A protein has these predicted regions:
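A Lys/Arg-rich helix-loop hairpin that forms a DNA/phosphate-binding surface
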Residues: 13, 26-51, 91, 188-193, ...
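Short, aromatic/basic-rich helix-turn unit that serves as a nucleic-acid recognition element
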Residues: 1-22
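Short, basic (Lys/Arg/His-rich) helix/loop patches that form interaction surfaces
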Residues: 32, 121-131, 140, 173, ...
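N-terminal DNA-binding recognition helix of tyrosine site-specific recombinases/integrases
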Residues: 21-24, 32-40, 51-98, 142-145
């Protein structure tokens, strides 16, 4: 893991985050020799992650999700694959043939206008700074980490530029005059500290019920859902969210007001010239 980070990992946007997770995983596995690691060993490790016998954060004390464990498997497998490409590893990848958990397409929750009002009011009562983080997420579709890591240099007049993003591309999103002024009224270069547990505490007191694992991401889903329901363009949404693959953005396409209804207007019979429509209806060959 140290060699992977030195030769490759430190160049990645999330390299330090992945390295920290890998170190925790290695310790939980008992720090075996790399040549002794087997798929059987990892299978027992991930079983303990699922049950919560092994956990790295209080929020996962009841057990990590299959999605998280699949991600951890990818991290560790990538260490061997990358070192092999670099000529530093000459043995087989011990996780190469290990199947990941099958993940069903999950429900994507989003907030209604009434729920947004309730959430913002409760956040403001808890801490106005927390409410501002939530507003930034709802106004821009930002990921939670992008919002809480926001710095003064990223905010220009009526615009926020998110940098060091998951997609590795900077993206600039317009914001309202009111939100801009609220952000710029804060002191310091770094505006926020991570208020995840504050947000968790507030959400538990609201009437809002969310699928597991969507606590902060529901804000991003809410932006995307309302964007599409208001007639927004799917390609514009892809750029705003910073998705590399349009398939990620297409998850929201069904929320567009004209989704599928275009089949009624744009099918080949509907687009026939009017005279041909009549002929087609009565079975006459033009």
């Amino acid at each position: 893991v140290e060699l992977w980070f030195k030769l490759h990992g430190k160049s990645l946007t999330a390299g330090e985050h992945v390295y920290d997770k890998l170190i925790l995983m290695v310790e939980a596995l008992g720090n075996p020799l790399a040549t002794d690691l087997t798929s059987k060993m990892f299978a027992h490790y991930r079983d303990k992650r699922l049950t919560g016998e092994i956990y790295f954060s209080e929020k996962w004390k009841k057990g990590a999700s299959p999605v998280t464990i699949n991600l951890e498997q990818s991290y560790l497998s990538s260490v061997f694959s990358e070192l092999s490409r670099l000529g530093e590893w000459s043995y087989p990848n011990p996780l190469e043939n290990m199947r990941k958990f099958t993940i069903a397409e999950k429900e994507m929750a989003w907030l209604t206008h009434e729920q947004i009002v309730e959430l913002l009011a409760d956040c403001k009562r808890q801490d106005p700074i927390l409410a501002l983080v939530v507003k930034i997420c709802l106004s821009t579709g930002a990921r939670w980490r992008e919002a809480v890591n926001l710095t003064r240099s990223q905010v220009t007049k009526y615009r926020i530029t998110f940098v060091r993003t998951k997609g590795k591309k900077n993206r600039s999103i317009p914001i309202s005059k009111e939100l801009y002024e609220e952000i710029m009224a804060l002191d310091g270069f770094n505006f926020f500290t991570d208020c995840y547990f504050q947000f968790l505490s507030v959400m538990e007191k609201t009437s809002i019920v969310l699928p597991r694992g969507q606590l902060t991401h529901v804000l991003r889903h809410t932006f995307a859902a309302h964007f599409m329901m208001s007639g927004g363009n799917i390609l514009a949404l892809q750029k705003i969210l910073g998705h590399h693959d349009i398939k990620m953005t297409m998850r929201y396409a069904h929320l567009a007001p004209d989704h599928l209804e275009t089949a009624l207007r744009f099918n080949p019979l509907a687009t026939l010239p009017s005279g041909d429509k009549v002929a087609a209806a009565v079975g006459i060959t033009p």
